[in-house]
Amino acid sequence: MEEEQDLPEQPVKKAKMQESGEQTISQVSNPDVSDQKPETSSLASNLPMSEEIMTCTDYIPRSSNDYTSQMYSAKPYAHILSVPVSETAYPGQTQYQTLQQTQPYAVYPQATQTYGLPPFGALWPGMKPESGLIQTPSPSQHSVLTCTTGLTTSQPSPAHYSYPIQASSTNASLISTSSTIANIPAAAVASISNQDYPTYTILGQNQYQACYPSSSFGVTGQTNSDAESTTLAATTYQSEKPSVMAPAPAAQRLSSGDPSTSPSLSQTTPSKDTDDQSRKNMTSKNRGKRKADATSSQDSELERVFLWDLDETIIIFHSLLTGSYAQKYGKDPTVVIGSGLTMEEMIFEVADTHLFFNDLEECDQVHVEDVASDDNGQDLSNYSFSTDGFSGSGGSGSHGSSVGVQGGVDWMRKLAFRYRKVREIYDKHKSNVGGLLSPQRKEALQRLRAEIEVLTDSWLGTALKSLLLIQSRKNCVNVLITTTQLVPALAKVLLYGLGEIFPIENIYSATKIGKESCFERIVSRFGKKVTYVVIGDGRDEEIAAKQHNMPFWRITNHGDLVSLHQALELDFL
């Protein structure tokens, strides 16, 4: 009975064990049963042992739901087990258990073909690479490497594709292809529908044109050295409408995925825009120069243009008249000034007699072709310039005016006739100025030039070495900019024997507009891709050169001319 009173103090047990315990206790407490079955005595004698085993203080009952799926592996638990990992569908390649690489690899973006992949057709289904024929994955298999695309326009575009790419076991590289576009069956992309990935685009069977330029594609990817998964390569393509597609090789570059940075149609070069804009902004009085600019067939081949000042740079003339040269170099002032005056007389003789300086003095031009647009091309072989009634005292070269006789259309045509005749005379006698002079004046000119060459210590001869060296180069040209009026400057060039060095279209007068504006006109003619070198002695050309970021070579003495020639010989200039 004492044992029955102690039962409530025992700990709680499982249902089956409680029943077995109660039966054992009832058998022990029943004397009748113990008398009939001797085995019960042995059970009673062993009761303390069973109480010692069954007594457990830390045993907690559990329900069947408390056991994990590890104990019941035969039963699938969708909420516990992870999603089966997709495996590669390509034969002959290693099976990977995870979608993440165990070892990080750096990404090296490159625009060329990556790691030996053939440039055409290697990424398309059915093409045979080195590893064998690429099989199109079936719907029951999952491809490790897939390409996802996003449509950026509602219209059918040939630039949106999804296709399988051969996996790489080492590096994850950005893939760029310019191969011929082909239609990919929808089954090649439908295999990814069972995977837990974002939405994929299924291709239709639209027909596209055979080929498009590679500049319309952009590749997106990581650009840092962090670890990158090789299981998914996302490629985005940006394209224009096929009707306006045009190649743009000069603008090709890798896109970062932003459509605004993708290459588009090829655009005009800045230098051409600058040339066109500068020509449109020119005033009407400079219309004629376009014809002269178009006559030069070698302008596009030029690499360097040398802009020369005339007086005190190539020739010594003004300092002869003022006597400053005689004072600087210790020469006889009377002889020096006399030689200068004689040369000045011959210059104006040629200008007045043969180059219409009396008519053109008041309507001077910057360039000989500035009024060529007003020339109607009339034959001038029998034309009388002395009786055509032209007077240049009031015209001042103003264009576009039709009021009265001076400055009108007829007046402008007669002015253009004279400048056309000046050009013809210059071209005819640029290598033989003696044809414009009488025999006596021709001999006088020869003596005068020899005398000036002695007085100036062969200044002109030293400068000619550099001029001839530049002229011998096919990609270089000499251009003359002088502050003398155009017609006297042409006469001066002829009399000093420089006609073959400077064609008339390469001579500019800065009397009206200044040297800086002359430089602008020359730059608009030859373009900004050409290198310009300014050679002179004055502050005006130095300032103009600095304004246009042109190198300036100062000439102040004979040594500067010698150094210039040495620099040219060594190809420094």
UniProtKB/Swiss-Prot annotation:
Keyword entries, A-Z: Acetylation, Activator, Chromatin regulator, Cytoplasm, Developmental protein, DNA damage, DNA repair, Hydrolase, Magnesium, Metal-binding, Nucleus, Phosphoprotein, Protein phosphatase, Transcription, Transcription regulation
Keyword Ribonucleoprotein: no
Keyword Mitochondrion: no
EC number: 3.1.3.48
Bias type Low complexity, positions: 254-271
Cofactor(s), by name: Mg(2+)
Catalytic site positions: D309 (nucleophile), D311 (proton donor)
Subcellular location per the Swiss-Prot or TrEMBL entry: Cytoplasm; Nucleus
Modified residues (Phosphoserine): S262, S266, S438, S472
Sequence positions bearing N-acetylmethionine: M1
Listed result of changing S266A: Fails to form damage-dependent nuclear foci or interact with H2AX
Residues bound to Mg(2+): D309, D311, D537
Region named Disordered: 1-46, 236-296
Superkingdom, natural source: Eukaryota
Enzyme class: hydrolase
Transmembrane segments: none
Gene Ontology biological process terms, A to Z: anatomical structure morphogenesis; cell differentiation; double-strand break repair; negative regulation of extrinsic apoptotic signaling pathway in absence of ligand; positive regulation of DNA repair; response to ionizing radiation; visual perception
Maturation and modification: Ser-266 phosphorylation is required for localization at sites of DNA damage and directing interaction with H2AX.
Annotated GO MF terms: histone H2AXY142 phosphatase activity; metal ion binding; protein tyrosine phosphatase activity
Cofactor note: Binds 1 Mg(2+) ion per subunit.
Subunit structure: Interacts with SIX1 and DACH1, and probably SIX2, SIX4, SIX5.
Protein family: Belongs to the HAD-like hydrolase superfamily. EYA family.
Role description: Tyrosine phosphatase that specifically dephosphorylates 'Tyr-142' of histone H2AX (H2AXY142ph). 'Tyr-142' phosphorylation of histone H2AX plays a central role in DNA repair and acts as a mark that distinguishes between apoptotic and repair responses to genotoxic stress. Promotes efficient DNA repair by dephosphorylating H2AX, promoting the recruitment of DNA repair complexes containing MDC1. Its function as histone phosphatase probably explains its role in transcription regulation during organogenesis. Coactivates SIX1, and seems to coactivate SIX2, SIX4 and SIX5.
Protein's name according to its UniProt entry: Protein phosphatase EYA3
Organism: Homo sapiens
